[in-house]
């Protein structure tokens, strides 16, 4: 569990340093499909490690990054949110308490000039963490609301 959360946190922080972008019209995994509208790019291929899958997307004009991670953790959405936000706080982030949003949970965070929001969902076997960071959280929310097509609706939030 700690390795999966560390992997997720490392990828989230690593994306802040990522400057290259590869164009992609669609991101497709076993868990979701995400169509990328104009301005959005997939900064690197979907990554898989230790059973976790992560897609990293960015919009340079909006200065916004979105990550979608699915991990094999048998936790509730609330427990996933609580543990992740606690780990982020220990790493120096300012974090909010997890807030229920339907069957999912969300939490806001910031560190120095970086602000973001994460959405946590679970289906009993897998957990997902969707994070939006950057200058325009609304741009990331719109991308997800309009373009995310989950394979399992329980694994993703119903609203952003």
Can you annotate each of these PLM segments?
Residues 8-19:
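Bacterial N-terminal signal peptides
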Residues 1-7:
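Positively charged n-region of N-terminal signal peptides that target proteins for export
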Residues 9-11, 32-37, 63, 68:
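Short N-terminal leader segment in a subset of presequences, especially plant chloroplast
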Residues 24-49, 99, 148-160:
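N-terminal "mature-domain start" segment
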Residues 40-41, 85-88, 131-160:
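Surface-exposed amphipathic alpha-helical segments
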Residues 45-127, 135-142:
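Conserved polar/disulfide-associated segments of primarily extracytoplasmic proteins
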């Amino acid at each position: 569990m700690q390795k999966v959360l560390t992997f997720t946190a490392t990828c989230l922080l690593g994306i802040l340093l990522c400057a290259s972008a590869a164009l992609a019209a669609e991101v497709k995994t076993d868990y979701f499909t995400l169509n990328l509208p104009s301005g959005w790019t997939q900064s690197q291929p979907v990554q898989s490690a230790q059973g976790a899958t992560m897609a990293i997307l960015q919009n340079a004009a909006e200065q916004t990054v979105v990550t979608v991670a699915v991990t094999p953790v048998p936790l509730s959405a609330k427990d996933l949110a609580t543990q992740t936000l606690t780990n982020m706080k220990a790493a120096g982030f300012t974090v909010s308490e997890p807030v229920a949003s339907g069957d999912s949970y969300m939490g806001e965070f910031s560190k120095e000039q970086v602000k973001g929001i994460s959405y946590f969902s679970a289906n009993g076997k897998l957990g997902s963490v969707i994070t939006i960071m950057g200058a325009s959280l609304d741009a990331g929310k719109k991308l997800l609301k309009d373009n995310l097509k989950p394979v399992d609706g329980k694994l993703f939030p119903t609203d952003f």
